[in-house]
Amino acid sequence: MAKSGIAAGVNKGRKTTAKEVAPKISYRKGASSQRTVFVRSIVKEVAGLAPYERRLIELIRNAGEKRAKKLAKKRLGTHKRALRKVEEMTQVIAESRRH
């Protein structure tokens, strides 16, 4: 609450200007920095896809999404990560079709 400058009441106390506090560093947890994103993109460009990613692409093209999701979950551990990876691989397929 803002101070009123009056000695009594709910907002009692001397009027002061609020100090501008920088946000905590911990609030950025999980967010990728520009540098990290850049380095990862370079590594992916140079190294290519992992063997399981190539297999995922093959499964998406032939057997459909369900098999691909099952394999991705087995390799990555969680359902959420698997869904994200399968979506990423479908984007890779779409990119390869465009070029």
Swiss-Prot record:
GO terms for biological process: cytoplasmic translation. One of its GO terms (cellular component) is cytosolic large ribosomal subunit. GO terms for molecular function: structural constituent of ribosome. It comes from the Eukaryota. Its main location: cytoplasm. PROSITE patterns: RIBOSOMAL_L36E. InterPro entries: Ribosomal_eL36, Ribosomal_eL36_sf. Keywords: Cytoplasm, Ribonucleoprotein, Ribosomal protein. It is found in: Cytoplasm. Pfam families: Ribosomal_L36e. Belongs to the eukaryotic ribosomal protein eL36 family. Component of the ribosome, a large ribonucleoprotein complex responsible for the synthesis of proteins in the cell. The small ribosomal subunit (SSU) binds messenger RNAs (mRNAs) and translates the encoded message by selecting cognate aminoacyl-transfer RNA (tRNA) molecules. The large subunit (LSU) contains the ribosomal catalytic site termed the peptidyl transferase center (PTC), which catalyzes the formation of peptide bonds, thereby polymerizing the amino acids delivered by tRNAs into a polypeptide chain. Component of the large ribosomal subunit. Mature ribosomes consist of a small (40S) and a large (60S) subunit. The 40S subunit contains about 32 different proteins and 1 molecule of RNA (18S). The 60S subunit contains 45 different proteins and 3 molecules of RNA (25S, 5.8S and 5S). This is Large ribosomal subunit protein eL36.
